[in-house]
Amino acid sequence: MLEKKATRSTRVDGVSGEAVIEEFERVTRDAANVQRETLRRILAENGGVEYLRGLGLAGATDPATFRARVPLATHADLEPYIDRIADGDASPVLTAKPATSISLSSGTTQGKRKYLLFNEELVKSTMQIYRISYAFRNREFPVENGKALQFIYSSRETRTKGGLTATTATTNVYRSEEFKATMRDIQSQCCSPDEVIFGPDFAQSLYCHLLAGLLAAGDVQIVSATFAHSVVLAFQTFERAWEDLCADIRRGEVSPSRVTSPAVRRAMAALLAAPNPGLADEVARKCAALSNWYGVIPALWPNARYVYGIMTGSMEHYVKKLRHYAGGLPLVAAEYGASEGWVGANVEPGTPPERATFTVLPDIAYFEFIPLKPVAGDGGYAEAEPVGLTEVAAGELYEVVMTTFAGNTRSSSSCMTLVAYYYLQSKKWMNICRFCISVHETSRNLVTCTFAATGHIMFAQK
């Protein structure tokens, strides 16, 4: 039944969470040197690729030569090279290591979604930031031996002319073995079987996520999704579907009108196993006792410690409704990233999402920041020369530029960020604005956030 369990702090991949935090603080304390070393590693690996060969680096790996020789790039500059790779060019065009697949960006450029390279380095950096973020969350909200009710979904996959899989970056991550291992390590193993995550129909997968979560209600310690709107949508669906869910639990069989996919039905049948009228009655009783569904998450998942997902930028719009469903449970803003790669971790998870800040990971990419100065009477911004991670000024607005192991070289991320203060020697940012975060938007002119209602990025000495 739905009983509360005691929790205590846990470990991350066999290492104590405090050790993960200590290593993170070590690299942020030495951010300038770590940034130089990160650039050196990227150029040592990729300096011989076609894109960089003709720029006159001549083996140099220092920031000054790199900035002098390599121009700032937009996605349009890199797109012809990415298209060649997608079409089957196996030579080292942008990266020495081959792309394993193509990621479709969540943003848009001139009305179409962008192609980006995806390789094992991106998987590694994703697992790195997951572990760091979890270590800080677990210090604030400890969990152990639990599961996560994760509303995560794969996207449709296509094949490029060259035979590479093209899908969203999250789908590429979910399909990796490293993802499953990391979720186990950080006590975030999904309640739902893979057949649900990779199911052919979104509505069927959402319904099964809810059903699997109810069946594992006593074990759920984290409720999460990539984006806040996915959690809100899930519980809006729950409001309409709870009676069907109870009926499925009562008879031990998933409704044929709700789920038609044979593979998903087989996977859910293994979870249901047998009728459970006691659990069905308890869920129904708890639902009937709720007032306008306020606090439905802690009511049905009493061991849940927090709700987790991206809640800044355009996702802040959903925080009020999410807080209604969460009742008194903390809302924790997830990591900060762009289509080009990860930027920072939320190292103060107890801070409300509206004030969430993100500390840049200096060893995950080489970062530069273009200062943006408002133009009087114009409504736009004038750009200055980029500065390094340790050169930004508190209270100023910047656009993030990234050089990564995945072939994004001095690539603009179309993210506006505000420097608030330093965390040790790294920067703490507030995400001010992202252009076209939704995969459904079709124009770069559709800016999905405003300066009055967004998250931010901060920097300050602590």
Curated annotation (Swiss-Prot):
ATP binds at S103, T126, N172, G337, A338, S339, E340, G341, W342. Transmembrane segments: none annotated. It comes from the Eukaryota. InterPro entries: GH3 (IPR004993), GH3_M (IPR055377). One of its GO terms (cellular component) is cytoplasm. Keywords: ATP-binding, Jasmonic acid signaling pathway, Ligase, Nucleotide-binding, Stress response. Jasmonate binds at S106, A334, E335, Y336, G337, S339. It catalyses: a jasmonate + an L-alpha-amino acid + ATP = a jasmonyl-L-amino acid + AMP + diphosphate + H(+). The keyword Oxidoreductase does not apply. Its EC number is 6.3.2.52. This is Jasmonoyl--L-amino acid synthetase GH3.3.
